[in-house]
A protein has these predicted regions:
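Membrane-interfacial helix termini and adjacent extracytoplasmic/periplasmic loops
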Residues: 18-36, 94-152, 233-235
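Hydrophobic alpha-helical transmembrane segments of multipass integral membrane proteins
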Residues: 43, 47-55, 59, 63, ...
Length: 293
């Protein structure tokens, strides 16, 4: 990690020294004119990751609870294998699935959300008329929402695996005691399992967030490039750090390459903080389980 950080810092120094503090606040990316910054791409990166985690986290927690508390033994092993298989699917496969299959359904979902929740700034769409049956749906395609849902499928197995492990460590004595006192299955989950696994749930969610922040291929295939500061996730266009690097690296040289390295350094630092924080929560949850045992 230290070697990677040093390499990126050395390579990015020329761009960082030229841009100065404006590197953090500039939305445009015009390295030829010396006018560039990570404000818009960092916002896009955060929005894609938040959409992904917002979709994946409830599914991951529900799946892990079902596997550890409800599913019979035979079905449990099958579900675990299916979740592990999802984690092994290459990113390009998810990206192609999102581009050619899911996007057609996603625009209808996005229009429905815009119709009922468009009064919220992040669900509004410029140029959209949700009340017109003949309105074009292209304003909803290639959006942060579509990219985020596809990335959610990629981070969900990671979150499920971590949460499943933590839920499986809930002390049997506490669960059996709750059942003996007349607790229902849902009551035991709510009163015993969820409080015990709180650290693992947070850690698993943040590990998924770290993965979502750096996802490249799927996002590059789906998201239409746009360098502007906006929080409208249903609207066409957006950008992320990893997509920017993937799109421009092959043609970049000299100062342009240094600018890309600077963007990569910023993403590296944020991802490192997120992953270390997630690991701390998970290890704390595990140590608590061992001490209780």
């Amino acid at each position: 990690m230290v070697a990677v950080g040093l390499f990126l810092s050395v390579q990015a120094w020329a761009a960082l020294s030229a841009a100065g503090p404006s590197f953090l606040t500039t939305a445009e990316w015009e390295t030829d004119r010396g006018h560039f910054g990570i404000a818009s791409i960092m916002l896009g990166t955060a929005l894609v990751a938040l959409v992904a985690v917002g979709v994946a986290m409830p599914i991951a927690m529900g799946t892990s609870l079902f596997i550890t508390n409800i599913a019979p033994a035979r079905l449990r092993s099958l579900l675990v294998a299916m979740v592990d298989l999802m984690a092994a699917v290459p990113s390009i496969v998810y990206g192609l699935w999102g581009l050619f299959f899911f996007q057609g359904m996603a625009v209808d979902i996005a229009r429905w959300i815009n119709t009922w929740l468009g009064w919220m700034p992040w669900f509004s769409v410029n140029g959209a008329d949700p009340n017109s049956p003949n309105a074009s749906l292209t304003v909803y395609s290639a959006s942060i929402f579509v990219a985020g849902v596809v990335v959610a499928l990629m981070v969900m197995p990671i979150q499920t695996s971590v949460m499943r492990e933590v839920f499986s460590q809930v002390p049997i004595g506490e669960r059996e005691g709750a059942y003996a006192l007349g607790g229902t299955r849902w009551g035991v989950i709510r009163i015993v399992s969820l409080p015990f696994a709180r650290g693992g749930i947070i850690g698993g969610t943040m590990l998924g967030l770290g993965r979502a922040l750096g996802e490249t291929i799927a996002v590059a295939l789906i998201l239409s490039s746009a360098f502007n500061l906006k929080i409208r996730v249903l609207e066409t266009g957006g950008n992320t750090v990893s997509k920017l690097i993937a799109d421009q690296y092959s043609e970049a040289s000299g100062f342009g390459l240094s600018a890309l390295m600077a963007a990569g350094l910023a993403l590296f630092a944020i991802t490192l903080v997120v992953n270390f924080t997630a690991s701390w929560f998970v290890s704390r949850s595990r140590s608590g389980a061992e001490s209780d045992g």
